[in-house]
Amino acid sequence: ALMLGHRMVEVFENNPNAKIGHGYTYSGHPVGAAAALACLVETKRLNVIENAAARGDQLFAGCQALMEKYDIIGDVRGGHGLMTAIEMVSDRATKKPIDAATATTVQEVAYQNGAMVRVSGPNLILSPPLVVTENDCNILLSAIDAGFAAT
């Protein structure tokens, strides 16, 4: 079923070759377009841009505080939105990467304490959702703290 305004109907009535290309998975499918519009409305309603900036600052500052606490943290990267990475090293001066077993310990203990984090080589990657709350960030930072404390 399709609903069209009078002006659109006239185009089709006056031109037998007129058509609306839709139904493709990659271009202008009405259902996909409706979903995209609904997402934009929710993005504005939930203030995700402002939230991501505030929570990103919170995570970055929290990870920098952890770096002061643990020598195993060689660097904290991010500070521009929510994505943050923690470089794990066995020697800060040489930046020698941490061994895989220690990285796994940090990840597993963080998980046991309520945070699912990703390890990629010697890096702990944080990429929480845009709707993450201040309390969620506190839990995440506490769980990561526990992970580093276990090493």
PLM regions: where:
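Conserved N-terminal phosphate-binding loop of PLP-dependent enzymes in the Aspartate aminotransferase
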Residues: A1-T151
